[in-house]
């Protein structure tokens, strides 16, 4: 049976050089999950505008299941600079994500970040959802200043089983928690897995008192947008599929590297990546 995954969070059009590319961490994650043989269901919101209608059409064409409501705010947008930094328009539709009633036991994992939790509207509904489901929670912090707080970070970590951060976010987390050791951090928040990504240098993977490192082959980076989300999708699918830990890490790194080598977050993954996970 395919891993069944809920992907909760924002839909955003990334404006790169003035050209719009459909993205948002939750959508990017779902797109890669489906390519790796999973069955993703996206929970998000768009505005009743041209971008919103375009997003719904594209998502339908992608074959991604969705619970996507229309919000009173415009569809999310973000200006992305050459370093991959985001200037996110706010407020936006992703501030008001309605969550339908979902059957407990119907899903294996829920993916979430911190950006969509900036609104109390979303935090309340997400907390209620997690109380109603027995599911593995994958937290990809995706810290986007100024759209996070210590309270949101700590609450999210307490809900999580698996956490992925990049190396800059890890430095921020160490300051907030005053915990330097990854295993001490995992013990404090009762995590089963922790991944720290380091861009072209690969990533570290912590689990069961063990640490693994992997560095993918060097690529020519075109656009880092969505690479971290692809890594998370590979990691989640690898964990749910019970493949060896080093293969989980390799899958995540190779998926992220493939996406970083093209412009925009939605590429068809090369067979060399997809073939690592034959379900």
Regions found by a protein language model. Give the residues of each.
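Conserved phosphate-binding/catalytic region of the ribokinase-like
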Residues: 1-4, 178-279
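Active-site metal-binding loops of divalent metal-dependent hydrolases
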Residues: 10-11, 25, 115, 141, ...
């Amino acid at each position: 049976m395919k891993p069944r995954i809920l992907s909760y969070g924002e839909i955003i059009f990334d404006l790169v050089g003035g050209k719009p590319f459909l993205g948002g961490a939750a959508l990017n994650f779902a797109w890669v999950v489906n390519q790796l043989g999973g069955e993703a269901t996206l929970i998000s919101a768009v505005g009743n505008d041209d971008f919103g209608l375009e997003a719904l059409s594209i998502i339908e064409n992608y074959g991604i299941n969705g619970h996507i409501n229309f919000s009173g705010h415009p569809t999310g947008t973000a200006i992305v600079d050459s370093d991959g930094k985001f200037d996110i328009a706010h407020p936006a539709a992703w501030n008001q994500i309605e969550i339908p009633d979902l059957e407990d036991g119907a899903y294996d994992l829920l993916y979430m970040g911190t950006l969509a939790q900036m609104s109390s509207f979303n935090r309340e509904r997400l907390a209620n959802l997690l109380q109603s489901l027995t599911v593995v929670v994958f937290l990809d912090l995706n810290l986007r200043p100024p759209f996070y707080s210590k309270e949101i970070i700590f609450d999210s970590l307490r809900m999580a089983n698996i956490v992925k951060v990049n190396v800059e976010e890890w430095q921020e987390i160490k300051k907030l928690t005053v915990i330097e050791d990854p295993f001490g951090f995992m013990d404090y928040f009762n995590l089963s897995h922790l991944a720290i990504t380091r861009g072209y240098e690969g990533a570290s993977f912590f689990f069961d008192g063990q640490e693994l490192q992997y560095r993918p082959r060097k690529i020519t980076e075109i656009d880092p947008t969505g690479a971290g989300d692809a890594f998370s999708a590979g990691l989640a699918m690898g964990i749910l599929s019970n493949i060896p830990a080093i293969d989980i890490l390799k899958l995540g790194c190779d998926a992220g590297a493939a996406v970083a080598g093209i412009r925009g977050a939605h590429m068809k993954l090369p067979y060399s990546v997809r073939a690592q996970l034959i379900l």
